[in-house]
Amino acid sequence: MPLCKTYYVNAETGRDSFDGLSEATAFASLRAVNRLTLQPGDRVRLACGSVFAGQYLHLTCCGSKDAPIVVGAYGDGPAPRIDADGQGIWYQDYGCPLDSPTHVYRGYVSSAVLLYDAAYVTVQGLEITNHSGAILGESYSQPDKMERTGVAVVAKDKGTCRGITLRDLAIHDVNGNVYDKHMNNGGIYMTALSPADEAATGPARFADVLVEGCYLYRVSRWGLAVGYTYAHAHFQGA
């Protein structure tokens, strides 16, 4: 069984050319973390006081029930801050039209943190924002405004995604699209998308999800939403 690793990231003193395996050889950016292939039991620790401006954390890794992957903080000072600033763009597609022709079901989304087909992953003790400031011509209620999320959690091609924990996160100033209610907009948003091969993987869904101690404010459209599923037709009238 491989040994678990702890990776350190310090925006002020780190370098992405380092190995990230000690505080003295910390990475500098989340780009280095996104390139890792994290294994069960691995840890990613962001230095307190670090601000990761224009960066994002997108993970597709799976821990295990006995050895989750944990992303958190280390050191003294303010919580590490991920400020996506409209970056971290990915494509959301339910794989089928939704229950109303006016509901947008696919398009590009900006997420500061994205857990995509991840399992047994804990994210804790971070500050997260995703506000692009004053974009020329963009208003609060603009219909084609960018879809933005603080934390997006997606199930698609791994069957049941288990063991996601979001703990003690301060998520704020996420100015998403207030019209596209089934897209990943707001503080925390979870969705199940149509699998490429449902016969092989089973339905896309979640189990054993825990959200605790999180503080969300100035987020739109939603604060916390377990949003929608490609299998909505099975639940009509429920």
Regions found by a protein language model. Name each.
Residues 1-2:
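Mature N-terminal, pre-catalytic/accessory segment of carbohydrate-active enzymes
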Residues 12, 47-49, 62, 73-76, ...:
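Beta-strand repeat scaffolds of extracellular/surface proteins
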Residues 9-47, 52-53:
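Acidic Gly/Asp/Thr-rich repetitive segments characteristic of extracellular carbohydrate-active
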Residues 5, 42, 55, 67-69, ...:
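The right-handed parallel beta-helix/beta-solenoid scaffold, focusing on the short coil/turn
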Residues 18, 34, 55-56, 132, ...:
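Activation segment
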Residues 62-144, 168, 173-179:
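Right-handed parallel beta-helix/beta-spiral solenoid domain characteristic of secreted/periplasmic
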Residues 68, 72-77, 119-130, 159-175, ...:
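Right-handed parallel beta-helix
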Residues 56-59, 89-114, 137-157, 179-206, ...:
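Extracellular beta-strand/beta-solenoid scaffold signature
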